[in-house]
């Protein structure tokens, strides 16, 4: 069933009316806001936001927030004599393994990499996993090796019990 052209034109009229009403309402709201902002800016725009701790005034809330963060930072009390007698050894970074000294933490980090690699190579010399069953079973001069025609389960049974004790499994498909 098709719509009549008159139904389409009627719905378009409604859409046009709604759009024009929305445009009118937006322009009215914008004018109201502009009036409020212009009156407020003349009276309270300068130094509108005030810090509760030190009573300093700021133009924006963001600036006040950044300033408030500075009140939370701990203040360092430094003795000037300690600064003068500051020893260079205190600024040096010391390797805990070989007691070598470095000027920066980055240099110490690069040096520590040498210790880590030497530890890894020492650990890799000694195998961490010990296998209880040998893959190859040597018996006098003949070698028993894995039979690739058998399943892994059958191979394990052969290695454990020998060929004579393994049950024969027929894997032929029945039609």
From Swiss-Prot:
Q: Tell me one Pfam family matched here.
A: zf-C2H2_6
Residue span of motif Nuclear localization signal: 71-78
Q: What keywords are assigned to this protein? A: Metal-binding, Nucleus, Repeat, Repressor, Transcription, Transcription regulation, Zinc, Zinc-finger
Mind telling me which InterPro entries this protein's record contains? Answer: Znf_C2H2_sf, Znf_C2H2_type
GO molecular function per UniProt: DNA-binding transcription factor activity; zinc ion binding
**Keyword hit for NAD:** no
**Zinc fingers (C2H2-type), renumbered ranges:** 49-71, 93-115
**Protein location:** Nucleus
At the top level, the lineage of the source is: Eukaryota
Triggers of expression: Induced by jasmonic acid (MeJA) and gradually by wounding. Accumulates in response to dehydration stress. Induced by cold, osmotic, salt and drought stresses in roots and shoots, and by UV-B and wounding in shoots.
Please state the protein's primary subcellular location. Answer: nucleus
Is Secreted set as a keyword in this record?
no
**What Gene Ontology cellular component terms go with this record?**
nucleus
Q: Where is this motif: EAR-like (transcriptional repression)?
A: 146-152
Q: Quick one: a GO biological-process term for this protein?
A: response to water deprivation
Cystine bridges:
none
What the entry lists under SMART domains is as follows: ZnF_C2H2 (SM00355)
Inactivation phenotype: Decreased tolerance to drought stress.
Tissue specificity field: Mostly expressed in stems, siliques and leaves, and, to a lower extent, in cotyledons, hypocotyls and roots.
Function according to Swiss-Prot or TrEMBL: Transcription factor involved in stress responses. Positive regulator of the jasmonic acid (JA)- mediated signaling pathway. Triggers the up-regulation of LOX3, VSP2, PAL1 and PAL2 in a JA-dependent manner. Promotes drought and osmotic stress tolerance by preventing reactive oxygen species (ROS) production (e.g. H(2)O(2)).
Q: What is known of its domains?
A: Contains a slightly degenerated ERF-associated amphiphilic repression (EAR) motif, which may be involved in the activity of transcriptional repression.
Protein name (database record):
Zinc finger protein ZAT18
Q: Which organism is it from?
A: Arabidopsis thaliana
This protein's gene is called: ZAT18
């Amino acid at each position: 069933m098709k719509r009549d052209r008159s139904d389409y034109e009627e719905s378009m009229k409604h859409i046009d009316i709604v759009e024009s009403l929305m445009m009118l309402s937006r322009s009215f709201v914008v004018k109201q806001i502009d009036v409020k902002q212009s009156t407020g800016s003349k009276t309270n725009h300068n130094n509108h936001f005030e810090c509760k701790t030190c009573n300093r005034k700021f133009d924006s809330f963001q600036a006040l927030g950044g300033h408030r963060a500075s009140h939370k930072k701990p203040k360092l009390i430094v003795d000037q004599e300690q600064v003068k007698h500051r020893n260079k050894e205190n600024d040096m970074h010391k390797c805990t393994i070989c007691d070598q000294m470095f000027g920066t933490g980055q240099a110490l980090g690069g040096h520590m990499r040498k210790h880590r690699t030497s530890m890894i190579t020492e650990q890799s010399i000694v195998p961490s996993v010990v296998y209880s069953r040998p893959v190859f079973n040597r018996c006098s001069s003949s070698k028993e090796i894995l039979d690739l025609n058998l399943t892994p389960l059958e191979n394990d049974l052969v290695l454990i019990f020998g060929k004579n004790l393994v049950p024969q499994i027929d894997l032929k498909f029945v039609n």
